C-alpha cells in the first residue's frame, strides 16, 4: 500500500508541476532526448496541448558524426537519436532534430565562457548554447528534464555505495587532472585535495538523516543531499547561463520543491525497486509512456564522440599556447601536456568530461584570462 500511495502521489505532483510550467503567452516547446525525464514531461505536455486542439513542439539534439563514432560507457550506454525520433512520432509532436556541426561546437567555447563568466563544462556548455540559439529562432520558452536524476536517484553513486565512501565527491574521478598540467610549484596539489576532501566530509556530516534509517535509506539521503547541493546546482547554472545568453527561457518542472520534499522521504527500496534506478518515477508513469522509453537505461545530455572535434580543439589550443599574450603558455608544464595527449582518454569529471573536454576547458581557461585580464604574480 505504501508503494502504491507513493506512486500515485508522485504522479500527481509531476503532472501538476508540468502543467503549471506550460502556462505561457509566447511560443513554448520541450527538449526531448528520448530519455525517461524529458519523455515524461513531453508526454504530459503533448496531452495538455491536444486538449486545446494544439500540437506540442519538441526538439532533440545530436552532433555531426556521432552516429559513426559513438562509444558506449557506464554513464552513456546508448545514443539518443533513435529514441527521440521514435517518441516524437509516438506522441505526435512537431519534432525537430538539431545537429551541431563540429566547428560550431568548438567555436562557441568562447561565447560559453562569456556566458558563464568563467571556464565551465567545455563543449557540454558550448553545444547547449548552440542548440538554445537554434531553438530561440522559433520558440521563447522551453521545458527541460533537469533535476530528476538528483531527486529520484538516477546517478550511479545512488546505488553504488563505494562511490560515496571515499575522500571526495563521487563525480570527481581524477582531482589532479588539471593541476598536474601546471608547472611544478605553481599550486600545491595536496592543499587543493585537502580543501575538496574537507568540503566533501563537511557536506556528508550535514546531511539530514533519521536514527532509524536503514543503511540503504541513509545512503539515499546522502546521495540526494550531495547531488542537489552541488551537481544539480551546477547543471542548473549551466542551463540558465546558456539559455538566457541566447534569450531563451528554460523551465525545469522537476525542480518543484514539493517533489524533492516528498521523494527525499520515500524509502530507497521503493525508489530502487527490482534494482532499477528511478523505479518510483517509472512506475508512476506506466500508462504515460511506451515500454521502450519507460525502461530505457539512463543516458545523460549527449557529448560529441567525433574525433574531429578533439583535433579541432587541440589545434585551437595550440594556437593559444603559441600566442605571446596567453597566460596558459606561461603556467603549462609542456611535458605533462604531451604525456596527457599520448595517454588514453579517461573520464576525469562528471559523466562526460574526458580528454577532448579537458582540452576545451584549457582553451576556455586561457580565453577567460584574456577576456577578464587575469594576471598571476610570480610567473
Residue ranges and their predicted role:
Residues 1-7:
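Short, small-residue-biased leader/transition segments that mark boundaries at the very start
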Residues 9-30, 134-138, 142, 235, ...:
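Phosphate/ATP-binding catalytic cores across multiple sugar-kinase/actin-like superfamilies
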Residues 13-18, 36, 40-45, 87, ...:
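Structural preference for long, well-ordered alpha-helical segments in enzyme cores
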Residues 29-31, 36-82:
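ATP-dependent adenylation/pyrophosphate-handling site
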Residues 30-33, 57-62, 97-99, 143-147, ...:
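Short beta-strand segments
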Residues 54-64, 75-115, 202-206:
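A conserved beta-strand->alpha-helix junction
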Residues 124, 141-143, 175-379:
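Adenosyl-5′-phosphate
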Residues 152-177:
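A mobile, often basic/glycine-rich helix-loop segment
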Amino acid at each position: 500500500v505504501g508503494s502504491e500511495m507513493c506512486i500515485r502521489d508522485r504522479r500527481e505532483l509531476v503532472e501538476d508541476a508540468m502543467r503549471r510550467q506550460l502556462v505561457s503567452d509566447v511560443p513554448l516547446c520541450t527538449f526531448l532526448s528520448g530519455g525517461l525525464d524529458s519523455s515524461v514531461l513531453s508526454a504530459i505536455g503533448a496531452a495538455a496541448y491536444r486538449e486545446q486542439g494544439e500540437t506540442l513542439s519538441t526538439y532533440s539534439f545530436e552532433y555531426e558524426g556521432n552516429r559513426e563514432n559513438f562509444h558506449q560507457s557506464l554513464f552513456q550506454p546508448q545514443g539518443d537519436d533513435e529514441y527521440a525520433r521514435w517518441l516524437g512520432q509516438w506522441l505526435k509532436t512537431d519534432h525537430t532534430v538539431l545537429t551541431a556541426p563540429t566547428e560550431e561546437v568548438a567555436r562557441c567555447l568562447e561565447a560559453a565562457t562569456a556566458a558563464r563568466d568563467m571556464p565551465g563544462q567545455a563543449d557540454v556548455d558550448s553545444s547547449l548554447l548552440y542548440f538554445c540559439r537554434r531553438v530561440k529562432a522559433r520558440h521563447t520558452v522551453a521545458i527541460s528534464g533537469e533535476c530528476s536524476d538528483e531527486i529520484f536517484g538516477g546517478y550511479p553513486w545512488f546505488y553504488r555505495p563505494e562511490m560515496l565512501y571515499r575522500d571526495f565527491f563521487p563525480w570527481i574521478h581524477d582531482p589532479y587532472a588539471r593541476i598536474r598540467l601546471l608547472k611544478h610549484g605553481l599550486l600545491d596539489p595536496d592543499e587543493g585535495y585537502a580543501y575538496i576532501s574537507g568540503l566533501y566530509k563537511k557536506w556528508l556530516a550535514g546531511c539530514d538523516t533519521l536514527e532509524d534509517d536503514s543503511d540503504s535509506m541513509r545512503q539515499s539521503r546522502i546521495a540526494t543531499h550531495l547531488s542537489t547541493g552541488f551537481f544539480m546546482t551546477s547543471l542548473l547554472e549551466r542551463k540558465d547561463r546558456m539559455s538566457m545568453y541566447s534569450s531563451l527561457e528554460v523551465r525545469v518542472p522537476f525542480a518543484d520543491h514539493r517533489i524533492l520534499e516528498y521523494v527525499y522521504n520515500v524509502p530507497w527500496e521503493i525508489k530502487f525497486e527490482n534494482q532499477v534506478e528511478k523505479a518510483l518515477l517509472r512506475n508512476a508513469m506506466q500508462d504515460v509512456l511506451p515500454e521502450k522509453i519507460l525502461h530505457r537505461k539512463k543516458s545523460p545530455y549527449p557529448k560529441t564522440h567525433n574525433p574531429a572535434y578533439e583535433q579541432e580543439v587541440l589545434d585551437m589550443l595550440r594556437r593559444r599556447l603559441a600566442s605571446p599574450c596567453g597566460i596558459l603558455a606561461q603556467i603549462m608544464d609542456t611535458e605533462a601536456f604531451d604525456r596527457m595527449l599520448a595517454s588514453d582518454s579517461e573520464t576525469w569529471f562528471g559523466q562526460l568530461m574526458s580528454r577532448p573536454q579537458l582540452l576545451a576547458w584549457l582553451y576556455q581557461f586561457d580565453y577567460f584570462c584574456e577576456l577578464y585580464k587575469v594576471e598571476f604574480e610570480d610567473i
